[in-house]
């Protein structure tokens, strides 16, 4: 998969997610939601999980592309410290002796780049600039996937910081729909932030 393909696949996934969100929030002629709140909340939670998966998939794919020597979207080559002959080997190299790699963990992603890429590399640069927001996405994703006392507490912590006051029993749909001071919802903010990050990584921007 080329770096252009990696970026396009990510963006196609996000567009599909936004379509589902839009469909869930259709209103009738009177301005009332067609679907009940419980349905809309379900779609939002599912969308957050899918969004996280799209981001993680992009990171794994772009790592493999760099390791295989694929050119970035600007025509350059991201220097790599290892060499593999095929995609399967690239995936195995990234996973190592683990059963899987935690692509939503920004610290681990940066550590991985230090093993296989030059010290200054596009993945490290992009991840370091988005770390706190990716951690927020991880918190929201975990709550969307499985609400427990632990995930609820962490979601409330994110919500409290966003709202500027203590939040209790926050809902995923409420957090991602929160309108920030810049006029964007939290969903729009994360969507735009990671779109820039994925584009810069694919471009090889250090």
PLM regions and their residue ranges:
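Charged, amphipathic alpha-helical oligomerization/scaffolding segments
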Residues: 9-12, 16, 50, 54, ...
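Long, hydrophobic, amphipathic alpha-helical segments used as structural scaffolds
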Residues: 55-70, 145-155, 198-206
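Helix-loop junctions and short alpha-helical segments
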Residues: 40-43, 47-137
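Charged alpha-helical initiation segments
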Residues: 1-53
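Short, charged amphipathic alpha-helical segments flanked by flexible coils
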Residues: 67-87, 152-176
């Amino acid at each position: 998969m080329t770096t252009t393909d990696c970026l396009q696949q990510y963006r196609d996934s996000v567009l599909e997610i936004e379509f589902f969100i839009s469909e869930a929030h259709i209103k009738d002629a009177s301005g009332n939601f067609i679907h009940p709140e419980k349905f809309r909340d379900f779609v939002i939670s599912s969308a957050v999980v899918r969004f996280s998966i799209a981001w993680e998939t992009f990171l794994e794919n772009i790592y493999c592309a760099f390791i295989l020597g694929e050119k970035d979207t600007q025509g350059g080559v991201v220097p790599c410290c290892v060499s593999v002959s095929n995609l399967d080997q690239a995936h195995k190299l990234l996973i190592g002796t683990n059963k899987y790699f935690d692509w939503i963990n920004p610290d681990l992603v940066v550590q991985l780049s230090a093993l296989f890429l030059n010290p200054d590399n596009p993945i490290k640069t992009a991840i370091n600039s988005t770390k706190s927001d990716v951690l927020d996405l991880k918190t929201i994703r975990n709550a969307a996937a499985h609400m427990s006392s632990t995930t609820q507490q962490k979601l409330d912590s994110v919500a409290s910081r966003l709202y500027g006051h203590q939040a209790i029993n926050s809902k995923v749909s409420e957090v991602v729909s929160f309108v920030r001071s810049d006029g964007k919802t939290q969903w729009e903010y994360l969507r735009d932030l990671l779109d820039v990050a994925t584009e810069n990584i694919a471009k090889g921007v250090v």
